[in-house]
């Protein structure tokens, strides 16, 4: 929901948004975003890593990241250029079927996992890895978890392959690490500032209000979460307004009432 007032509502004010948005003929540029933004960057970055080093650890990690990103692309579009991208210096690559892409990705994950497992004690420097601070074992668990996720996505169309990949992903025999099992295994890039705090306070001085759309539903159902989400409004008795949870209409630049 949009909690808007003052700076937080800038994009919804008339001078920025107003009536310039088309409700009935919105842009469809988003349909190609994964092709235009994700695929070129992923392939280019993968090639940059291979050109910069022969170290199998960063190359394997880059391979895992490539699969993580492009698995979403093939999930979205189905057939995509994949297995022959960049081969022999060609600028054009044929499309692979979604099955071919998935099978190739499984092979790449397996290769990366095996390579990292052999080199599991040879961590990267923390500055070179903003996700796991160079911890190779964390990347192995991430790759196995990604393999498990992909295996579950094909369980109704390719049960045999799915079962094989699931067993490989969760296998902890003979010192294998298996999948992520605790919060410390989560893959994320830490930020120094909480983005929600930045939006609600740094940008807006704490003047963040519940929208009328949200408060009307919550009031109608007497939602007990209201006391957690906000505080009750306070009005002068002369205004003949009952104090409670009153949301602001989306787009108000300067709220008259608080709460």
What are these regions (language model features)?
Residues 1-12:
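Single conserved hydrophobic/aromatic residue that forms the stacking wall/gate
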Residues 13-65, 69-259:
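Structured, solvent-exposed acidic/aromatic patches
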């Amino acid at each position: 929901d949009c909690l808007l007032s003052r700076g937080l509502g800038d994009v919804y004010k008339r001078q920025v948004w107003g009536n310039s948005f088309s409700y009935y003929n919105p842009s469809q540029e988003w349909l190609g975003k994964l092709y235009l933004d994700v695929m070129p960057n992923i392939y280019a970055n993968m090639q940059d890593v291979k050109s910069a080093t022969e170290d199998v650890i960063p190359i394997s990690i880059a391979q895992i990241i490539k699969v993580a990103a492009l698995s979403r692309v093939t999930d979205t579009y189905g057939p995509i250029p994949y297995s022959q991208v960049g081969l022999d210096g060609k600028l054009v690559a044929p499309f692979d079927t979604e099955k071919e892409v998935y099978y190739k990705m499984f092979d790449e994950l397996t290769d990366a996992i095996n390579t990292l497992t052999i080199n599991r004690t040879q961590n990267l420097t923390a500055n070179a890895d903003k996700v796991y601070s160079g911890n190779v074992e964390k990347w192995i668990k991430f790759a196995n978890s990604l393999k498990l996720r992909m295996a579950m996505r094909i369980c109704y169309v390719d049960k045999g392959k799915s079962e094989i990949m699931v067993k490989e992903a969760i296998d902890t025999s003979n010192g294998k690490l298996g999948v992520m099992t605790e919060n410390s295994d989560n893959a994320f890039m830490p930020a120094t500032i909480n983005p929600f705090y930045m939006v609600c306070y740094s940008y807006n001085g704490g003047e963040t209000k519940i929208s009328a759309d949200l408060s009307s539903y919550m009031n109608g159902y007497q939602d007990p979460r209201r006391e957690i989400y906000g505080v009750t409004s306070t009005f002068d008795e002369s205004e003949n307004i009952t104090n409670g949870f009153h949301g602001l209409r989306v787009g108000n630049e300067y709220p008259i009432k608080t709460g």
